[in-house]
């Protein structure tokens, strides 16, 4: 029953599963247990999270699974919110709907959202797209681009565990060795976010330095989120960029 409870909780708090489909899945899970478990599960309520309203999310996952298995490219359209709080297909400057041709490699869940890890055909790097925002997807006959040929791949096959550890916010940019200084109260937060592969050094009663190989934009966002308790030390280009960005933020709040 405890295992079923964990599965049901994952349905309740998942942002990538539409509410109606989540309810159906929960009923199926409940049917695997006894009446006592069902009487307890009625008292479990989800937080008021913003859930996807894309009813085709499972179809998208099935198509992407098939394309990954066959090593084929896919074509899709991509949606985003506008100020009317509704999803709209992304368009080109001429007003036509923009189409994306990509090679899919993996799908992963991060912070309750399903992401597609792929290569956008025009470039030689890695891109991440929200699966619930994909529309009108179809598999193409064209063979996909091998992951080993991409920039930043190191000519190695994709390691999903390593990729997720280095891309904590699912940004697609270059990885780097980053060193930052934190207050010691944040040690647990750092390990939760970056894993136990981090290295600690230069420890004092109040602060410690952290070194980690991570996506550079993720490190930048982390430092902004937790400033001034996190200070980037290296690389210098990232430290300089953060200093300039924080200066602009300060100026934006000046009267």
Describe the role of every protein-language-model region.
Residues 1-13, 95-96, 101, 204, ...:
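Short, basic/aromatic recognition patches that contact phosphate-bearing ligands
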Residues 1-87:
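Bulky hydrophobic/aromatic content
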Residues 65-127:
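Loop-centered beta-sheet repeat module
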Residues 106, 113, 133-135, 229:
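Structural motif
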Residues 107, 137, 200-201:
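A structural signal for short hydrophobic beta-strand segments in well-ordered beta-sheet cores
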Residues 123-160:
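Flexible linker/loop signature enriched in Pro/Ser/Thr and Pro/Gly
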Residues 157-255:
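Polybasic (Lys/Arg-rich)
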């Amino acid at each position: 029953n405890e295992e079923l409870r964990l599965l049901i909780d994952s349905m309740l708090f998942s942002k990538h599963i539409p509410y109606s489909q989540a309810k159906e899945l929960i009923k199926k899970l409940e049917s695997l247990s006894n009446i006592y478990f069902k009487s307890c599960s009625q008292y479990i309520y989800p937080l008021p999270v913003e859930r996807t309203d894309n009813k085709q999310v499972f179809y998208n996952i099935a198509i992407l699974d098939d394309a990954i298995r066959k090593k084929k490219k896919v074509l899709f359209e991509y949606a985003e919110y506008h100020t009317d709080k509704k999803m709209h297909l992304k368009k080109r400057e001429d007003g036509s709907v923009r189409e994306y041709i990509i090679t899919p490699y993996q799908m992963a869940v991060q912070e309750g959202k399903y992401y597609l890890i792929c290569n956008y055909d025009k470039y030689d790097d890695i891109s991440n797209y929200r699966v619930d925002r994909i529309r009108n997807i179809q598999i193409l006959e064209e063979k996909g681009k091998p992951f080993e040929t991409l920039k930043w791949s190191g000519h190695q096959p994709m390691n999903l565990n390593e990729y997720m550890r280095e891309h904590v916010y699912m940004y697609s940019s270059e990885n780097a060795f980053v060193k930052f200084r934190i207050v010691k109260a944040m040690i647990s937060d750092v390990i939760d976010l970056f894993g136990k592969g981090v290295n600690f050094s230069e420890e004092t009663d109040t602060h410690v330095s952290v070194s980690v190989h991570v996506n550079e934009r993720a490190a930048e966002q982390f430092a902004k989120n937790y400033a001034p308790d996190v200070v980037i030390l290296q690389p210098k280009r990232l430290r300089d960029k953060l200093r300039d960005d924080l200066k602009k933020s300060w100026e934006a709040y000046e009267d």
